[in-house]
Regions:
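SIR2/sirtuin NAD+-dependent deacylase catalytic core
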Residues: 55-58, 66, 100, 104-107
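A polyampholytic, Gly/Pro-enriched intrinsically disordered region
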Residues: 57-69, 172-180
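Cytochrome P450 catalytic domain signature, combining two hallmark sequence patches
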Residues: 55-61, 148-152
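PAPS-dependent sulfation machinery
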Residues: 1-15, 28, 62-88
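PAPS-dependent sulfotransferases, especially Golgi type II membrane carbohydrate sulfotransferases
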Residues: 77-125, 131-217
């Protein structure tokens, strides 16, 4: 029951994508009870752009996609783009993906910067590129905040995900990610080398303007 949940002081986990730009209700409702972990990643990856491009194609066509849609000139668009529909509608699926990544990043940055001074919530921003190389740096901070310690279960999960890694893409094989563009490097590459390789791939299917936008992010 709810009373038992509250009495035992349980931790309620809630995870979703692209949340920071729309997270105000969480901060307003929970305030000092909220532990907000913002995992961010360099968007210069063909996996991320390809994955989001597929969703951009689905939004407006499939009403089961789980996203609130708005109607404009007899067509449906995801609510994220409500203020820039004419611009958004002219883009290819991959360019729409980059458009939304920029929108979420900038709006999310603005919101979180405001919330840090307005609310007493615990906010931890975690760069994915740093997490896979130095996981305990962040795990220990989270564990301390919720009053626990990293144990053998934690270590087992890290091992299953091959963390810490020798390179960014040195992850265990996953068909879902593979089908959307992820490829494990055949040799150990630096973060800069991996990003440059991915940038060249992405440049083959987006405009110069979209690529420059991705560079800025």
């Amino acid at each position: 029951s709810l009373n038992k949940f509250i009495k035992e002081n349980r931790v309620m986990h809630y995870m979703t994508h692209s949340m920071s730009a729309y997270s105000k209700p969480l901060f307003e409702t929970l305030n000092e009870r909220l532990i907000y972990l913002r995992l961010v990643r360099n968007p210069m990856t063909d996996y991320m752009v390809n994955h989001l491009a597929k969703w951009c194609e689905r939004w407006g066509k499939d009403f089961r996609s789980g996203v609130t849609l708005i109607k404009f000139e007899e067509k449906y668009f995801p609510f994220f783009a409500k203020d820039k529909i004419p611009e958004y509608s002219e883009l290819s699926p991959h360019e729409k993906a980059i458009f939304l990544l920029k929108l979420w990043q900038e709006k999310g940055d603005h919101q979180i910067d405001q919330f840090k001074s307005k609310y007493n919530s615990f906010i931890l921003e975690i760069p994915f590129e740093s997490l896979v190389f130095q996981p305990m740096k962040y795990i220990n901070k989270i564990a301390e905040e919720i009053g626990v310690t990293a144990d053998k279960v934690t270590k087992k999960q890290l091992k299953l995900q091959n963390v810490p890694r020798k390179s960014l893409s040195d992850a265990p094989f996953n068909k879902y990610y593979f089908d959307r563009g992820w490829r494990k490097s055949k040799k150990i590459l630096s973060l800069e080398e991996e990003i440059e390789i991915l940038r060249k791939k992405i440049s083959n299917y987006v405009s110069v303007d979209s690529l420059e936008c991705l560079d800025e992010l």
